[in-house]
Curated annotation (Swiss-Prot):
Modifications after synthesis and translation: During the catalytic reaction, a sulfide is transferred from Cys-165 to a reaction intermediate, generating a dehydroalanine residue.
Self-association and partners: Homooctamer; tetramer of dimers.
Native species: Haloferax volcanii (strain ATCC 29605 / DSM 3757 / JCM 8879 / NBRC 14742 / NCIMB 2012 / VKM B-1768 / DS2) (Halobacterium volcanii)
Protein name: Thiamine thiazole synthase
GO biological process: thiamine biosynthetic process; thiamine diphosphate biosynthetic process; thiazole biosynthetic process
């Protein structure tokens, strides 16, 4: 088998191809229907469901990678669990899984397979991604309705103040989905601005020094404990999070662990069914808020067809 070589392209042509394509897409995304802040499992599911129904949706993710904690289960083990009926999302994604001997309706899948399949599904549906981009503030309108977000490149945050002063930019949207996990950064900013009382954050202020932080006052990595939500209780947590997913402030919907912080609900640890189904519930909430004439999102999904 012979190889005839690649086609010719200069370095400048490669650079222009990248920058022109990125800028064209970015300009289109400065005013969109839904901005999903956080590209973890709940945010990806919500973006996928919305994009499949023709909603213009952009995911803003502060890391270089998507997926949040969905790549791994607990304790650096790369197996993830879901409980019935969330395995139907894995069926839809084509991700294999096995039922555990530990409990009926408890399923185990490979984290990298499940996470990469979900990322692909969101991209294939038409969701656009702005990664390495950090949420820094909200755009407010009349009556404190949120009308978009303020954002900056993630590396800017890591630079010492003496070395840089880089203003952020703002993008507008009809809705913002806080899918940022334990820290609930969109809700935290609204609380900081004094326009929203967030149960979990108020509890943290009363009983702790504040939201979970590491050195130098920075937020901890995804998966760290947070006084914004309650302690671990798998069965109570997952049901409660899906039930409480929805609008939390005019222009803002919350999903996933951000819901636990919003309502001071228990955490569920390394099981992901609530993240997946909360994403679906959040997508339906967004459709309702937008008034879109689109097929409803089935929260638990149709039962798999019989063989």
């Amino acid at each position: 088998m012979s190889f005839d070589g690649f086609t010719d392209a200069t370095e400048a042509q490669v650079t222009r191809a990248i920058s022109d394509s990125w800028m064209e897409e970015f300009r289109e995304r400065t005013d969109t229907e839904v901005i999903v802040v956080g590209g973890g499992p709940s945010g990806l599911v919500a973006a996928k469901e919305l994009a499949e129904r023709g909603v213009d949706v952009t995911i803003v993710e502060k890391n270089n990678y998507l997926g949040g904690g969905f790549w791994l289960g607990g304790f650096l083990m790369n197996k993830v669990t879901v409980r019935d009926p969330a395995q139907r999302v894995l069926d839809e994604l084509g991700v294999p899984y096995e039922e555990s001997d530990e409990a009926e309706g408890l399923y185990v899948a490979d984290g990298p397979h499940a996470c990469s399949a979900l990322i692909k599904a969101a991209c294939d549906a038409g969701a656009k991604i702005q990664n390495m981009t950090e949420f820094t503030d909200v755009v407010l309108r009349e009556d404190d309705r949120v009308g978009g977000i303020v954002m900056n490149w993630t590396p800017v945050h890591a630079l010492p103040r003496e070395l840089t002063c880089v203003d952020p930019i703002a993008v507008e949207s009809d809705l913002v989905l806080d899918a940022t996990g334990h820290d609930a950064v969109v809700l935290s900013k609204l609380s900081e601005r004094g326009v929203l009382d967030v149960n979990g954050i108020e509890h943290a202020k009363e009983h702790n020094t504040g939201m979970d932080k590491t050195a130098d006052g920075e937020y901890g990595a995804p998966g760290h404990d947070s006084p914004g939500h309650d302690s671990m209780w798998v069965s109570e947590s997952e049901d409660s999070i899906v039930d409480a997913t929805g609008v939390v402030h005019p222009g803002v919907v919350a999903s996933g662990m951000a819901v636990a912080t919003a309502h001071h609900l228990p955490r569920m640890g390394p099981t992901f069914g609530a993240m997946l189904l909360s994403g679906r519930q959040a997508a339906q909430s967004c459709l309702d808020e937008l008034g879109r004439d689109a097929p409803d999102v089935s929260i638990s999904g149709p039962a798999p067809a019989d063989d």
